[in-house]
């Protein structure tokens, strides 16, 4: 799914699913008033992305971050910058897409496609 940025520029929405490590927990327990949201907003802005939210979760992932970015490379730069900091163990990136738009495109070409013969 894309959001319109300017006349000809669009940004895609990305979900960052992260797993924090002991270093993150130790740092936050030493200074629980740290505003990690502000840090991520600044990182996103420096790369031309828009930060939306940072949520801590229970389950397979400890944290979910939502941002709009102009391309996957920007999202990947955000991921590697955070990972390089050492307090996050891993981050998976999911790119949101418009299923209806995909379905229209796929439907427009499926009748003309033939699978390879066995």
Regions picked out by a protein language model, each given a short descriptive name:
Residues 2-118:
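A compositional/biophysical signature of low hydrophobicity enriched in polar/charged and small residues
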């Amino acid at each position: 799914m894309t959001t319109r940025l300017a006349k000809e520029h669009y940004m895609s929405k990305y979900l960052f699913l992260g797993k924090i490590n002991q270093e993150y927990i130790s740092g936050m327990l030493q200074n629980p008033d740290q505003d990690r949201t502000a840090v991520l907003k600044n990182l996103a802005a420096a790369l031309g992305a828009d930060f939306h939210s940072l949520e801590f979760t229970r389950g397979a992932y400890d944290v979910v971050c939502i941002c709009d970015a102009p391309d996957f490379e920007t999202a990947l730069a955000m991921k590697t910058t955070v990972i390089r900091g050492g307090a996050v163990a891993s981050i998976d990136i999911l790119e949101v897409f418009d299923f209806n738009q995909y379905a229209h495109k796929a439907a427009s070409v499926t009748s003309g496609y033939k699978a390879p013969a066995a």
